[in-house]
Amino acid sequence: MWQFIRSRILTVIIFIGAAHGLLVVGPKFIRANQEYTLVISNFNSQLSKVDLLLKLEGETDNGLSVLNVTKMVDVRRNMNRMINFNMPEDLTAGNYKITIDGQRGFSFHKEAELVYLSKSISGLIQVDKPVFKPGDTVNFRVIVLDTELKPPARVKSVHVTIRDPQRNVIRKWSTAKLYAGVFESDLQIAPTPMLGVWNISVEVEGEELVSKTFEVKEYVLSTFDVQVMPSVIPLEEHQAVNLTIEANYHFGKPVQGVAKVELYLDDDKLNQKKELTVYGKGQVELRFDNFAMDADQQDVRVKVSFIEQYTNRTVVKQSQITVYRYAYRVELIKESPQFRPGLPFKCALQFTHHDGTPAKGITGKVEVSDVGFETTKTSDNDGLIKLELQPSEGSEQLGINFNAVDGFFFYEDVNKVETVTDAYIKLELKSPIKRNKLMRFMVTCTERMTFFVYYVMSKGNIIDAGFMRPNKQTKYLLQLNATEKMIPKAKILIATVAGRTVVYDYADLDFQELRNNFDLSIDEQEIKPGRQIELSMSGRPGAYVGLAAYDKALLLFNKNHDLFWEDIGQVFDGFHAINENEFDIFHSLGLFARTLDDILFDSANEKTGRNALQSGKPIGKLVSYRTNFQESWLWKNVSIGRSGSRKLIEVVPDTTTSWYLTGFSIDPVYGLGIIKKPIQFTTVQPFYIVENLPYSIKRGEAVVLQFTLFNNLGAEYIADVTLYNVANQTEFVGRPDTDLSYTKSVSVPPKVGVPISFLIKARKLGEMAVRVKASIMLGHETDALEKVIRVMPESLAQPKMDTSFFCFDDYKNQTFPFNLDINKKADNGSKKIEFRLNPNLLTMVIKNLDNLLAVPTGCGEQNMVKFVPNILVLDYLYATGSKEQHLIDKATNLLRQGYQNQMRYRQTDGSFGVWEKSGSSVFLTAFVATSMQTASKYMNDIDAAMVEKALDWLASKQHSSGRFDETGKVWHKDMQGGLRNGVALTSYVLTALLENDIAKVKHAVVIQNGMNYLSNQLAFINNAYDLSIATYAMMLNGHTMKKEALDKLIDMSISDNNKKERYWGTTNQIETTAYALLSFVMAEKYLDGIPIMNWLVNQRYVTGSFPRTQDTFVGLKALTKLAEKISPSRNDYTVQLKYKKSTKYFNINSEQIDFQNFLEIPEDTKKLEINVGGIGFGLLEVIYQFDLNLVNFEHRFKLDLEKQNTGSDYELRLRVCANYIPELTDSQSNMALIEVTLPSGYVVDRNPISEQTTVNPIQNMEIRYGGTSVVLYYYNMGTERNCFTVTAYRRFKVALKRPAYVVVYDYYNTNLNAIKVYEVDKQNVCEICEEEDCPAEC
């Protein structure tokens, strides 16, 4: 078969000057800190030697000299001379040239412009996965290389930035230090981040070096993959598409299930659909109805949904299938791009089927214009019709025509070459390319050669050259050693003079290896999950090695996250790339010529095609429960040992799948090494279990726990499968209550998934361990796994907490009584009582930082609860000189996540909004800006310009009177609604400006105008909420009326419990009281603030937070500020807890800051007494909880539910309608949320909401708890009906279902709510149990 494969681009530009028998060759490009080599050849028969002055010089655009180097050299007859120039490290951009002048009577002058290349380093990024879920950790490596693929000596650090899809800076490393050219770090993604494509960018000296993207989204990693391909290449004449559908688990075994196939033709309209049962592989034919094509090919779209049997897990694949008019295509391949008039021209028509195989037996008429060529030919076994054409001396163009008998037509023109000589030289490689081995080349010339020169070029420079003297031969065997300097790629150029014309040729050398010849292998290609695997590495002693392994299933999303051999080749080529021009070989080789009039350079010297050149390629037991199901692992760095090798033993995850393992190595001298392709290995067991468990169930429901058994041993076996009752959490339906396990037996044929299930009830709330073991052959082969499902209460849990605070400056003894307020209608057995002693005010806040509020946080304001408390905790820890570094690290890490979350709500004008891309909010922008400013003390990722822009936006919204009004929607009426002259919002914005040192100066006029407005309004403020924020603003400003405002605020307060507590009774009493406490701290009224603190701590949740975002923000801020003044450093006291007839003792000293708790309080206890004796500070907390049936709640919303008829037990469609019931005409709620919980066994897909009303649209939707709950957000609600339909699907079998519920409530006043229950099918145990599970009554 003929091969006409185009050679690759030469990555070194060379200039050649031939005059007086002198040939000068050198690189066209120069770089800083790199050698520049010039080669001068003397083939002058008259002069025994020539003397030359070489001058390399450069200057900037304004004439400043940046380089001036001269060298005197002499070159003897029939010899080469290599001259090296070392370019300085600090070489900068400029205009450079080299000049060669003859000396001592030798007349010669040539100069050439050189091109400065600034690119001296390149970068790569490796990420451990292509896609991440919220809450995942992103591991990444940055690799920086110089032009020789080594760590650059001058680059010690880089600037790394990670941005979210809106280009907000989420994390940055300003000075990321490189080790062996590598920087490695990670990013913890927040639980509710902005979904989409994120970006990692790397900068050096202010210029971007490299960037890479990864995706953040909700996804489920499929256990199997589906491939859809045409069974035969579809042609128009077939009028059908025949498809092969293959479904295999990632560990290679076939999947059984149903494939739903849909065909879409023109305009993306559904043409037809079919279903077929598939076990591993299936075929289906989709016939067209008069399908006509307008072109030679046309795409149709096929969508295949494959549903796995027993589990209903689904994989959807969409494919573009091309339908062709003809069964083949043709391409003209030529020995050279152009023909020479008067010389033979070889070419061929290559016929290929659309699958890439040669199309033989294609017959047609071949016509070539201008030469009178006409014949009928048939393609041979290689799909070729070979042609040897004889263009005449006067031929200008060849028009090659092919007409097949089936109507296929092809035409292409070939132009003549503008030539100066018929002579040419050819270089052919005649041996393999191997490191340190001899390479043999055949040099062939049409003229008898008296000399030729060869040049070896690599990495932008000439690394070797030679002057060869054949004895007037036309063929010569050139032998060169393949040195390490040539690796990974090089070029060999040969040149000679034939009759006053320089002719030349070249060959590419691609070693397919790197100087750092790193190798990685594993001891087994198939291994059991959870077992050890041995990795063997070899390379340069002491070299750095980076390893990574990930689940092959991730490649279904993307594979650009990893580093591959091809990436290294692209980096290398990127240093030396030149645009190829197939008609100008000088351009492609990077050559330009300088010569006298009587010596010319040939312009068409590519006589033959050449192959790409490549080198050869190197080559009675304990049962452990599978609990580690990672998607990526082995993200590890090691060093090669002194011997040049290293072994590593690692435990593989418990997942049954296929894995990709990759590795690279970096050595300071030999540079980068990487394995040729990822190592693929499989974790699979001869016998194993696959689970299909629900996310959650309700206590008391009968639930089918389903598993599938797989047997790969080639024969049928009886399997014993045991489900365990772990910690007495589980009841086996139809079995004795005392059973600790339940064993079933089932026959498992080979290579077929066999389902087995257990009918159970959950006895306890919380997390229930599901532990299952299966064995065959008397236990010779076993598998076991353990997972957790959540057990939810039948009713709504009602958590409560009573708190007393004490602060003894000297020794005291005091008793605190606690009477528990437990509803008489509480569910039996649901009561839990706990005592907790906190020697530190923020202990529980710190412990629960990542879970302060149980309510949804799906808008820009609520989301701040994941950000602000971390700032307050860090303020407190630093203010009190805490040495608890792990707490500081936890708060800082969560602060970063909260920042990520919040950046979702940044608007294009620099402000912040309550929803993504929904418009700006004055209130929220003030809230976020002041928080970001404070947070910047603890994380450098926050852009000061971003905070400044938000505050500038705020300042621009001030009214001429000094007042601020909300520009966006109102969802927090008291703050934003403009009620009572807008005092609350104006005060709030002023506090944001006053708490920012830059804004306080920049916007001093805005602040002054605002304070004037507040002081003018002070006499008319009668609302405690407004006054509390205004007073705090005046305190921050140091206003002359601050004392008057505080006195007025104190007059509005309420004292109770013998003046041990003080608070302000408004609809926002926690927020109001907290602002008042902040003013007390600013006024240094610490002792007077303690009664306020007493009341505030009594309002807290079990987690240490308050009911809502603003309560938590201001409440914790106030408590923190006072707590900083009341240090627990003097604690020394004893606490007695008395209940019924029992007593429990606790001793506290100044070194204890963690809480102590006691859980063993009987549930029928109604009263506790706690005695404290000693000196110090502490919180006494009695936490209790009970479940209350849903019918016992009062309603302030109208809520209606309608279960629609779907005709199927597997689909649930629930119509939900809600509206606010106002006390005053036309009044509205604050932000309203509707939460729909689903019955056990049902889950929603990604888009569950339809048929929503549009008068008051839904602003946001959250899917929670594994798809078992959906939350809808509204700005507010009035009397209008707000309706939507939610659709869910039954994925698991459940009997005795508890009712599910829908709740609607006002986020800022949760006393305004409504709850309704609903039920679905009332299946009993007998309807879902299998024979051996069924109780006697069935």
Curated annotation (Swiss-Prot):
It is found in: Secreted. InterPro entries: A-macroglobulin_rcpt-bd (IPR009048), A-macroglobulin_rcpt-bd_sf (IPR036595), A2M/Complement_sys (IPR050473), A2M_N_BRD (IPR011625), A2M_TED (IPR041813), Alpha-macroglob_thiol-ester_cl (IPR047565), Alpha-macroglobulin_TED (IPR011626), Ig-like_fold (IPR013783). GO terms for biological process: antibacterial innate immune response; antifungal innate immune response; cell aggregation; defense response to symbiont; positive regulation of melanin biosynthetic process. Glycans are attached at residues 68, 199, 242, 312, 481, 637, 728, 813, 828. In the hemolymph, the full-length protein is cleaved by an unknow protease into a 75kDa N-terminal (TEP1-N) chain and an 80kDa C-terminal (TEP1-C) chain which remain non-covalently linked. The TEP1-C chain contains the thioester bond which covalently binds to the pathogen surface. Cleavage is induced by bacterial infection or aseptic wound injury. During embryonic and pupal development, the cleaved form is the predominant form. N-glycosylated. Induction: By parasite P.berghei infection; expression picks 24 hours post infection and increases again 4 days post infection. Pfam families: A2M, A2M_BRD, A2M_recep, MG2, MG3, MG4, TED_complement, TEP1_CUB2. Keywords: Disulfide bond, Glycoprotein, Immunity, Secreted, Signal, Thioester bond. It comes from Anopheles gambiae. Disruption phenotype: RNAi-mediated knockdown in females causes a 5-fold increase in the number of oocysts following infection with parasite P.berghei. Inhibits SPCLIP1 binding to P.berghei ookinete surface and to E.coli surface, cleavage of CLIPA8 in the hemolymph and causes a severe decrease in phenoloxidase (PO) activity. In knockdown mosquitos infected with bacterium E.coli, survival is reduced, bacteria proliferation is increased and PO activation is severely reduced. GO terms for cellular component: extracellular region; extracellular space. Gene3D superfamilies: 1.50.10.20, 2.20.130.20, 2.60.120.1540, 2.60.40.1930, 2.60.40.1940, 2.60.40.2950, Alpha-macroglobulin, receptor-binding domain, Immunoglobulins. The gene is TEP1. Heterodimer of a TEP1-N chain and an TEP1-C chain non-covalently linked. Forms a complex composed of TEP1-N and TEP1-C heterodimer, LRIM1 and APL1C; the interaction stabilizes TEP1-N and TEP1-C heterodimer, prevents its binding to tissues while circulating in the hemolymph and protects the thioester bond from hydrolysis. Mature TEP1 and to a lesser extent full-length TEP1 interact with SPCLIP1; the interaction is induced by microbial infection. Disulfide bonds join 1217-1283, 1326-1338, 1329-1334. Residues 580-609 are annotated as: May contain the cleavage site. There is a cross-link at residues 859-862 (Isoglutamyl cysteine thioester (Cys-Gln)). Residues 1-21 form the signal peptide. Plays an essential role in the innate immune response against bacteria, fungi and protozoa infection. After proteolytic cleavage, the protein C-terminus binds covalently through a thioester bond to the pathogen surface resulting in pathogen clearance either by melanization or lysis. Initiate the recruitment and activation of a cascade of proteases, mostly of CLIP-domain serine proteases, which leads to the proteolytic cleavage of the prophenoloxidase (PPO) into active phenoloxidase (PO), the rate-limiting enzyme in melanin biosynthesis. GO terms for molecular function: endopeptidase inhibitor activity. It comes from the Eukaryota. This is Thioester-containing protein 1 allele S3. The keyword Phosphoprotein does not apply.
